[in-house]
Amino acid sequence: MEEVLKGTVNFAAAVQVTLMALTGTLLLILLHRIFTAKNWRNQSGVPGPGWLLGLGPIMSYSRFLWMGIGSACNYYNEKYGSIARVWISGEETFILSKSSAVYHVLKSNNYTGRFASKKGLQCIGMFEQGIIFNSNMALWKKVRTYFTKALTGPGLQKSVDVCVSATNKQLNVLQEFTDHSGHVDVLNLLRCIVVDVSNRLFLRIPLNEKDLLIKIHRYFSTWQAVLIQPDVFFRLNFVYKKYHLAAKELQDEMGKLVEQKRQAINNMEKLDETDFATELIFAQNHDELSVDDVRQCVLEMVIAAPDTLSISLFFMLLLLKQNSVVEEQIVQEIQSQIGERDVESADLQKLNVLERFIKESLRFHPVVDFIMRRALEDDEIDGYRVAKGTNLILNIGRMHKSEFFQKPNEFNLENFENTVPSRYFQPFGCGPRACVGKHIAMVMTKAILVTLLSRFTVCPRHGCTVSTIKQTNNLSMQPVEEDPDSLAMRFIPRAQNICGDPHLGEKTEE
């Protein structure tokens, strides 16, 4: 486990130092584009930074590179209001945090495209491949059917048992994640759980979870680093090379796993059950998908959980311990509805307190708090003209704290005491490009939390809360793991039920 942490921290540190060193050089090179561009001036009337003889676009773009996408979005919405206009890599970009504007974009077929650096997407294999950033709509619709089939129906029903089994498996070897002081590396525990779940549901072949997690972390760091970089960044081979190698490392590993799966299928006398990877391989055999399509789809299915669901669970455990009354209510609900047995699919709809807790956690401290889209045709949003090709960033996290909720800046289950209209709460998006895994994500979250909380109460280090730990907000909200020991927690068997933390009952506010 120390190797996982060391590899992750060293790679992330190298990424940060390199990007900071290059920012000045890259922005100077962009000057030529700035002063020769014809369509960068504000034609829409949306509030935002001024042109300033071409310095406005440079300054706004540099802020995104420097602060990260999520943090920069919050900065501009705070400064200019719920609809703000900036420039990213020379392209006019609207940042929306008003519910009416966000809902309009989510529900419309005009905004099913996504924007990012073409070369950046090519680096990570997402340019016109996979499902996450694929803007080849014909191919996207085709592969989405495979994701939908795997993430709904029988796959959804099966996920509860798989989550229970995978969680218990890792909890039974908790000592492998525990240091000499008795603190558990909870982030990597959760990552191992969700990788195991993903493999059992979608790939079903033997793999080294910890080794794969190292590669996933490097890939994710590369994804964040290259997503909105200018083209010149990719010409600097002495810098770009390590990102290219990190992405290729996971792509090659996924290629090997897919080939291993293919051989396993060929060696079967009878195929009683199919899964996500099997369906994709059959599609390739019928020339419906390419080898690269299959590899990228499997890659995206496998990486989706470790750096979204696992981090969400981590934040939820922190919030739970900051709100001990809520933890008490959840545990009592589990005991009354489930008792000593394992949770089953039919139990989930009975766990109302847990449901409200998860929703409030996703609202109050989301891992992914924005969505990137592109206008396919001219449109109008809340009275503002949106030209074809305009980029849009939907600042969902800020929207969740600025409208509708009675206590928007406080973690409080009363925010979900009554039904919340969908236009005001969109943790997974909605409409034609909604997150295809939104239903299974909720099921997995519930199953893992119930299994874990039935056995243990989790105690973070003193002073470790969602508002005090260091975090970055670029592609997603991530705890900074420079000192992973500070993020470790004690796992105390539920029968003992003591943490020794004098601040357990404090209200959580931001």
From Swiss-Prot:
Tissue expression as described in the entry = Brain specific.
**Record's Gene Ontology CC terms?**
endoplasmic reticulum; membrane
Q: How does it sit in the membrane?
A: Peripheral membrane protein
Q: According to its UniProt record, which reaction does this protein catalyse?
A: testosterone + 3 reduced [NADPH--hemoprotein reductase] + 3 O2 = 17beta-estradiol + formate + 3 oxidized [NADPH--hemoprotein reductase] + 4 H2O + 4 H(+); androst-4-ene-3,17-dione + 3 reduced [NADPH--hemoprotein reductase] + 3 O2 = estrone + formate + 3 oxidized [NADPH--hemoprotein reductase] + 4 H2O + 4 H(+)
Q: Where does heme bind?
A: C435
Name the domain of life. Eukaryota
Q: Which UniProt keywords apply?
A: Heme, Iron, Lipid metabolism, Membrane, Metal-binding, Monooxygenase, Oxidoreductase
Task: Give the InterPro entries listed for this entry.
Answer: Cyt_P450, Cyt_P450_CS, Cyt_P450_E_grp-I, Cyt_P450_sf, Cytochrome_P450_Monoox
Please state where this protein is localized: Membrane
UniProt cross-references to PROSITE patterns, sorted A to Z:
CYTOCHROME_P450
Query: What GO biological process terms does the UniProt entry carry, in alphabetical order?
Result: female gonad development; lipid metabolic process; response to estradiol
Task: List the cofactors.
Answer: heme
Q: GO terms for molecular function, please? A: aromatase activity; heme binding; iron ion binding
Q: What Pfam families does the annotation carry?
A: p450
EC numbers, comma separated: 1.14.14.14
**Primary localization class, coarse:** membrane
In UniProt terms, what function does this protein have? Catalyzes the formation of aromatic C18 estrogens from C19 androgens.
Give the family per the record. Belongs to the cytochrome P450 family.
Indicate what this protein is called per its UniProt record.
Brain aromatase
Q: Which organism does this sequence originate in?
A: Carassius auratus
The taxonomic lineage of its organism, from the top, reads: Eukaryota, Metazoa, Chordata, Craniata, Vertebrata
